[in-house]
């Protein structure tokens, strides 16, 4: 099953780099930002949208004005992790709230675990996760790294896509939590920090300690049972 993820999720997988991992360097893409269209009308039912690179920015600008929640709870196999999302990174906060309300993260996994570095979640190698992605759409988010947030321990950040991506556009379906003591500041500027753990770092540490295979995938799957809005 783990091989399947390369086949049907490869275009949006993470590329959060550590000292052993390099991000592909590729030809820049032209901007796909377009003016607000009827397809991105904020009065249209949100459930009717299929997001893409042309409408995602306008959609989340409108979504941000109506959905002001900022605190979420991640229920994992090892316990609860509460996260506060930063208002300053509005696209990433709104994206996380949107996916939470869509129940996208439910039954995904922490699929990349590196002790004293990060735990990365929001993906899976099963077909239900693929189908949820297809219903939501295919899109990337801008790198919004200049809001003053650093990759300190406990910070929540968004990895970049593994596709041709010199601007480190963010893969919206995944996130990682910095577990490293003292932070992982070599990531600053390359990835968008959009939240922080306010309760449950002991759970993060437990997940970071699980045995993994050569690709950093836990030998025993660590599930995100659900993500819910607290306030």
Language-model segments: what does each one mean?
Residues 1-4, 18:
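Positively charged n-region of N-terminal signal peptides that target proteins for export
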Residues 4-12:
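Sec-dependent N-terminal signal peptides
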Residues 16-231:
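Cyclophilin-like peptidyl-prolyl cis-trans isomerases
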């Amino acid at each position: 099953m783990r091989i399947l993820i390369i086949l049907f999720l490869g275009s949006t997988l993470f590329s959060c780099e550590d000292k052993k991992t390099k991000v592909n360097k590729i030809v820049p893409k032209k901007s796909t930002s377009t003016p607000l269209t009827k397809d991105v009308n904020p009065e249209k039912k949100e459930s009717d949208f299929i997001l893409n690179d042309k409408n995602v920015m306008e959609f989340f600008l409108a979504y941000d004005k109506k959905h002001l929640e900022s605190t979420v709870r991640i229920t994992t196999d090892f316990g609860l992790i509460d996260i506060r999302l930063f208002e300053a990174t509005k696209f990433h906060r709104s994206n996380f709230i949107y996916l939470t309300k869509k129940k996208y993260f439910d039954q995904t996994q922490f699929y990349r675990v590196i002790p004293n570095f990060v735990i990365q979640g929001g993906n899976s190698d099963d077909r239900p996760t693929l189908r949820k992605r297809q219903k939501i759409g295919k899109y990337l988010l801008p790198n919004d790294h200049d809001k003053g947030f650093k990759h300190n321990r406990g910070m929540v950040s968004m990895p970049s896509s593994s596709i041709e991506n010199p601007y480190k556009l963010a893969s919206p379906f995944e996130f990682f939590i910095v577990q490293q003591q003292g932070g992982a500041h070599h990531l600053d500027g390359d990835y968008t920090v959009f939240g922080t753990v306010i309760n449950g770092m002991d759970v993060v540490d437990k997940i970071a300690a699980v045995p993994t295979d050569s690709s950093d995938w836990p030998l025993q799957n660590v599930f995100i049972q659900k993500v819910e809005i607290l306030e």
